[in-house]
Swiss-Prot record:
Keyword flag Chaperone: yes
Function: Binds specifically to cytosolic chaperonin (c-CPN) and transfers target proteins to it. Binds to nascent polypeptide chain and promotes folding in an environment in which there are many competing pathways for nonnative proteins.
Species in which this protein is naturally found: Caenorhabditis elegans
Summary of subunit composition and partner proteins: Heterohexamer of two PFD-alpha type and four PFD-beta type subunits.
Gene: pfd-2
Keyword vocabulary terms for this entry: Chaperone
Any one Gene Ontology molecular-function term assigned to this protein's record: protein folding chaperone
Database matches in InterPro entries: PFD2, PFD_beta-like, Prefoldin
Protein's recorded name: Prefoldin subunit 2
Family: Belongs to the prefoldin subunit beta family.
Classification via Gene3D superfamilies: 1.10.287.370
């Protein structure tokens, strides 16, 4: 609805509009949270991959150290490689699941947007609306 239509809406209609907008914002926030988690998981997976690339050619009995929480723990290369491979495999699975969730959340967001006829304003439209409201003029519907 335009600002003119919103001003003429009943309090019940305004409350319904507010709820629709809040739900849209919540869905968008959830989508952004999932995307951030995907990014974090992918970075962690790449980091494990880089470590694996570095140590795979070392002697199996060579010492290496791994930081677990705040403790540096001594291992041998042969003990760490399977753990790294397992971590990479698990992170790949989690990443795929999160990507699937991201796609589903995007579909849910688009459905909500279409169902409630939500249109995002461009920067220019937003500036014009703010300017018109500041001047006390209502924009064209």
């Amino acid at each position: 609805m335009s600002a003119a239509q919103t001003a003429a809406a009943t309090p019940a209609e305004q409350e319904e509009q507010r709820k629709v907008v809040e739900k849209f914002k919540a869905l968008r926030d959830q989508q952004q949270d999932i995307a951030a988690e995907v990014t974090r998981i992918e970075e962690e997976r790449r980091e494990f991959g880089r470590v694996l690339e570095v140590i795979k050619d070392l002697e199996p009995d060579q010492k290496c150290f791994r930081l677990i929480s705040d403790t540096l723990v001594e291992y041998t290369v042969k003990d760490v490689i399977p753990d790294l491979q397992n971590n990479i495999a698990n992170l790949t699975i989690v990443s795929k699941q999160l990507n699937d969730q991201l796609v589903e959340k995007g579909k849910e967001l688009n459905t909500h947007k279409t169902t409630h006829n939500i249109r995002l304003l461009t920067e220019k439209e937003s500036a014009e609306l703010r300017k018109a409201e500041a001047l006390g003029q209502l924009p064209k519907a």
